[in-house]
């Protein structure tokens, strides 16, 4: 069992106690903003390192120019979508999120498409199906629509729980015990907690932390301590930049930061997913899960 899964299972299970006294929307937004700042956004700070490992042998020292241009172009395309076709952009964002979460969290190379969709749809579908009234205002704001239009659509999407449940059954047959435990506490969190808080927990503790540790192993697969230092050093500038932006949003009110945060995440999801799908597949393979020593037991175990 990896350290990351132990942390995820314990943290999310403990957080479910918040259901005894549900936090206010402001408190949920503060957790989301803090989590995205400290873990969520920084986990994409490694994209240029992954790109360098693949593109430098082809393009030499000038590899960064086409990478940066492509990254900004993809992010800009999504941002333009929020302006011109917000409803279509929201649907695209949700679809990409399912694929990205599923591929990153379900070890899709081992369990196949059922595992990818089962795990990837979990945070999206459970939010919509179990808490449509709470999700509708956020989706309406993102899509530049009205709650009265969005809410019936979300309620009508509840039927998707049935095919998703069948995929979960298929996936659990190939999953490890701790993968099933993580999925169970994640489902419990989305059932018991407000959807914004449940998503913040999933995105930061499950998805982003797993990605950070995997890329830490890419930096130094032989020395766990050096890998941790590399993670902090690489993610530090992005974390500071996010902290400045988060402070600016918080000054205006943490509740007003919810929609901008999701729009920025959507804009960065497309280029980040391109890196994780295309470039990581061509980079030197690294151990999944956490930094570890190849010649001795991991100090993170």
Question: Over which residues does each language-model region extend?
Answer:
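N-terminal membrane topogenic signal
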Residues: 1-11, 63
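C-terminal ends of transmembrane helices
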Residues: 44-54, 98-110, 166-176, 211-220, ...
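Hydrophobic core segments of alpha-helical transmembrane domains in multi-pass membrane proteins
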Residues: 30-40, 86-99, 183-187, 198-210, ...
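Predominantly late transmembrane helices and immediately cytosolic-facing juxtamembrane segments
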Residues: 193, 202-219, 227-232
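Long hydrophobic alpha-helical segments that form multi-pass transmembrane helix bundles
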Residues: 113-173
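Hydrophobic, membrane-inserted alpha-helices
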Residues: 11-18, 69-79, 98-101, 164-168, ...
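Membrane-interface helix-loop-helix junctions at boundaries between adjacent transmembrane segments
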Residues: 53-56, 60-62, 72-129, 136-137, ...
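Short, hydrophobic transmembrane alpha-helix segments
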Residues: 16-30, 250-253
């Amino acid at each position: 069992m990896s350290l990351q899964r132990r942390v995820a299972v314990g943290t999310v299970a403990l957080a479910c106690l918040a259901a005894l006294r549900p936090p206010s929307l402001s408190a949920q937004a503060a957790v989301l903003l803090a989590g995205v700042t400290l873990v969520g956004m920084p986990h994409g700070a490694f994209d240029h390192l992954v790109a360098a490992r693949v593109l430098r042998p082809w393009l030499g020292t000038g590899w960064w120019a086409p990478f940066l241009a492509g990254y900004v172009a993809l992010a800009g395309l999504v941002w333009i979508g929020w302006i011109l076709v917000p409803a279509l952009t929201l649907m695209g964002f949700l679809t990409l999120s399912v694929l990205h979460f599923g591929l990153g969290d379900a070890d899709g190379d081992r369990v196949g498409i059922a595992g990818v969709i089962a795990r990837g749809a979990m945070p999206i579908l459970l939010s919509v199906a179990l808490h449509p009234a709470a999700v509708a205002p956020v989706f309406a704001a993102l899509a530049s629509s009205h709650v009265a239009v969005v809410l019936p659509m979300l309620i009508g999407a509840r039927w998707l729980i049935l095919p998703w449940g069948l995929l979960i059954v298929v996936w659990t047959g190939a999953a490890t015990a701790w993968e099933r435990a993580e999925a169970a506490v994640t489902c419990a969190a989305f059932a018991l907690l407000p959807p914004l808080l449940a998503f913040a927990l999933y995105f930061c503790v499950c998805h982003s932390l797993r990605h950070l540790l995997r890329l830490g192993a890419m930096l130094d697969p032989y020395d766990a301590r050096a890998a941790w230092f590399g993670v902090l050093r690489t993610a530090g500038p992005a974390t500071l930049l996010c902290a400045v932006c988060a402070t600016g949003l918080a000054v205006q009110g943490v509740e007003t930061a919810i929609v901008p945060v999701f729009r920025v995440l959507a804009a960065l999801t497309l280029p980040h997913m391109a890196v994780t799908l295309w470039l990581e597949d061509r980079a030197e393979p690294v151990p999944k899960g956490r930094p570890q020593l190849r010649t001795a037991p991991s100090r993170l175990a």
